[in-house]
Amino acid sequence: MRPFGTVATAMLLAASAIGIAGPTPTARAYTKEEVAINGTYRVTSIGNWAKYNEQYNGEPTTVQTWTLSSTCTTYQECDGTVKSDEGWSARLYMLDGTSWYARHEVPNWEHCQDGTAFTGKQTFSFYPVDPDGSGYLQLGSPVMAGRNKTVGPSGACGQNQWLTIDMPMRLDKIG
């Protein structure tokens, strides 16, 4: 006697092979121009879901306005610039056809009890998602989801550990 899971899997595979399970989605080809992201975005880093050294810890929610400008050499490789209304700018790039990255340094990010301060390295990673909130990848979407992660240097403030704050973020195209 076969386990139910094996029989169910065989039936599903057979149904898919003969088309009973319904039509398969059609593939859509994207051009490099459709993959590039350009425009003005509201960027919200969601503080109440922040992790402080891998432990959930409420941080303030932050909102920035970014101007993104990019061009792509292929549908998988893109390069550009992000300019924040907070006064910084950084390289914007994508190497895999879906995920975008921007990195910059945050001066005086980690403050110590003795009055010294250390620079943090902030990395933003994000990808376009279905605007309905499902979280599914959707190239060309005006909504993006991702992470905002800042890491301080090991040894700062007398601690042999990096201070790391990681929080989810959302980008909404506003112009």
Task: Name these PLM-found stretches.
Residues T31-Y56, V82, M144-K149, L171:
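Tryptophan-anchored aromatic micro-motifs
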Residues G120-G155:
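Internal, hydrophobic beta-strand segments that form the core of beta-sheet-rich folds
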Residues M1-A29:
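Secretory targeting and sorting signals
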Residues E59-D130:
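Predominantly extracellular/secreted and cell-surface proteins with exposed
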Residues I37, Q64, I165-M167:
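Residues that flank catalytic or metal-binding motifs in active/ligand-binding sites
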Residues A145-G175:
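Edge beta-strand at a domain terminus
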Residues R2, S16, T31-V35, N48, ...:
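Extracytoplasmic/secretory-pathway segments with low complexity and glycosylation-like composition
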Residues N48-N57, E110-A117, G152-W162:
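Flexible, membrane-facing loop/turn or short amphipathic-helix motifs
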